[in-house]
Amino acid sequence: MTDSLVRATAAKGGIRLVAVSTTESTKEAKERHSLSYLTSAIVGRAMSASLLLASSMKVNHGRVTLRISSNGPLKGLTIDAGRDGSVRGYVGDPSLELDLIKNKSNHYTFDFKKATGIGYLHVIRDDGKGEPHNSTVELINGGIGEDIASYLLHSEQTPSAVFVGERINQDGIVCSGGLLAQILPKAERDYSLIDLLEDRCKEINSFSELLNKKGNNLISLIEEIFPDLDQSPSDIISTSQEVRFKCRCSRERSLSALKILGKDELQKMIKEDGKAELTCQFCKNVYLVKEDELISLID
C-alpha cells in the first residue's frame, strides 16, 4: 500500500484540510537509517508535518526543509519534503531509545520532549525564486504537532490545528501520518466555524488511535474527526497525490561536491586512498569514486 496526501476544503471553502499517510515512507527511513522505535516515531512525525507544510506551496517544485537544533540526545533532525510528495530525512542519533512516559490520557508514549531537549524548530520554504524563506520558533514539546502549530501561528499568522502520530508495535511500524486544519481568510470572521473547529480538535484524545483505525483512508479520517463541517461527506472537495520516500542525491551531485573541495584536497585523496567514498546523509546511499574519476575532476 502506498502513502498518499489529500487536500480538501470544507465548510463551503472556509476550512482547508490536509491529511497525509507516511507509513511506508517511515518504514523505508527506518530501514535506511537503522532507526530505533523512538527515532522512527520522530522521523515519521516530522516527515508528515513537512509534507503538510509543503502541500501549500504554489509551485510543484517547491520544497520545505524542517530542522530541529537542540540540546537533547536526539542530536538534531533534518527533513526535506516536496510539493510533489517526495520526502527524505535523518536524525543525529538514529539509535536513541528512551523510557516511555504516561501522557494526559494515561497512555504510554514516547518521551519526545526529553529526546529533543531545549532548542529551536527551523522551517525553510523554497519556491525556487530568490532566497528561501527562513523561520525559527522555540520548540514546544518536541512532539512535532504543537511545534508546527506554533510556527504557523507566529511565523505565518495562521491559526492552525496540526496532528501527527503513529502506531508502532514489536513487529514494527503499523501506521504513521498527520492532519492539518486551517481557517481560510474568507472565514476568519466566522466565529461559529472557528469555535466548531476548536471544539472538534479538543475532542481528539489520541490522533494515533484514529489514524490506526482508518489506515490509509484519509477522507474517512477527515470525516471521522470533523463530521459536522458539511452536511454530507460529498461536500468535502478533495484531491489526492502519492507520497514516497525519495532522495535527490545522485552520482553527478556527488562528483560536483568533490570538485568543490579543490585541487589540493583531491590530490591528497588520490595520494592517500586512491579513491573517495561519499555517503548521502538523507538516504545512506554510498557513492564510490575511483582514482581516474578523481583525476578527471582536477583536469
Swiss-Prot record:
The keyword Zinc applies. Keywords: Chaperone, Cytoplasm, Disulfide bond, Redox-active center, Zinc. InterPro entries: Heat_shock_Hsp33, Heat_shock_Hsp33_C, Heat_shock_Hsp33_N. GO terms for biological process: protein refolding. GO terms for cellular component: cytoplasm. One of its GO terms (molecular function) is unfolded protein binding. The keyword Disulfide bond applies. Disulfide bonds join C247-C249, C280-C283. It is found in: Cytoplasm. Under oxidizing conditions two disulfide bonds are formed involving the reactive cysteines. Under reducing conditions zinc is bound to the reactive cysteines and the protein is inactive. Its main location: cytoplasm. Redox regulated molecular chaperone. Protects both thermally unfolding and oxidatively damaged proteins from irreversible aggregation. Plays an important role in the bacterial defense system toward oxidative stress. Belongs to the HSP33 family. HAMAP family: HslO. This is 33 kDa chaperonin. It comes from Prochlorococcus marinus (strain NATL1A).
